């Protein structure tokens, strides 16, 4: 359950287009505690962890999410408010 309290500032390591979707790879201080299929909020947008590699994890934002949030405007090395 999300608390509304920002737990960490994540850093975008990589952005990769996948059709109309966007794969977002993020590093954060608690990546080692995450699990595949876990929900994590990014700038208030709940996304599901689809991959974990070292100190970074990957989520997918679909086109509708990109159209209705600021996630489509992000660039590599930008910071994200992270809540879990």
Q: What is each of the regions a protein language model found here?
A:
Residues 1-84:
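Conserved loop->alpha-helix
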């Amino acid at each position: 359950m999300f608390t509304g309290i920002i737990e960490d500032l994540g850093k975008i390591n990589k952005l990769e287009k996948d059709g109309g979707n966007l794969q977002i790879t993020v590093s954060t201080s608690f990546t080692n505690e995450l699990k595949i299929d876990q929900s994590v909020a990014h700038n208030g947008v709940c996304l599901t962890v689809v991959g974990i590699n070292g100190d970074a994890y990957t989520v997918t934002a679909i086109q509708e999410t990109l159209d209705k949030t600021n996630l489509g405007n992000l660039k590599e090395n930008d910071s994200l408010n992270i809540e879990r």
